[in-house]
A protein has these predicted regions:
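Glycine/proline-rich active-site loop of Rossmann-fold NAD(P)-dependent oxidoreductases
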Residues: 22
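Conserved C-terminal "lid"/linker of ANL adenylate-forming enzymes
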Residues: 9-17, 25-32, 38-138
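Short acidic amphipathic segments
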Residues: 1-10
Length: 138
């Protein structure tokens, strides 16, 4: 991904997947004024990454990559974004109104999705959907 001329920075993380645990996911910051599209970047990845399983299953453009104070990509923030997106998609697909309110770094459980239940969905219903994933939820 980083070899594409329009890519300024790329962060690749494992996003949750109910079937295999995690799948590759890329967040890309483009160089200023680039008009490159997600589809172009996916095609570039497919053409240049030798291992098919390593090609990102989700690619998202970001205005600015989250960084540490020394300028390195802050991957925990990217993981939180991926967990939020994947869990919300799963809840929506199951026709549940609950959504991820935030993802916290729990001292014992690690990254944990905090679910806003809105008083509508039974936690057992939510569990049937989210317990399939590797990251915890509350």
């Amino acid at each position: 991904m980083a070899s594409h001329p329009a890519v300024a920075m790329v962060g690749v993380i494992g996003q949750p997947d109910a079937r295999v645990g995690e799948l590759p996911c890329a967040y890309v910051e483009l160089i200023k004024n680039s008009k490159t599209t997600v589809n172009e970047l996916i095609k570039h990845a497919e053409d240049n990454i030798g291992e098919k399983a390593a090609v990102p299953k989700h690619l998202e453009l970001v205005n600015e990559m989250p960084k540490t104070p020394v300028g390195k990509i802050f991957k925990p923030e990217l993981r939180k974004r991926a967990i939020t997106r994947v869990y919300n998609e799963a809840l929506e697909k199951a026709e549940l109104s609950s959504r991820v309110q935030e993802v916290i770094d729990h001292p014992k459980k690690g990254l944990t999705a905090m679910i806003a239940k809105n008083g509508v969905n039974d936690p057992k219903q939510i569990g049937k959907i989210l317990d399939k994933f590797i990251f915890k939820w509350e």
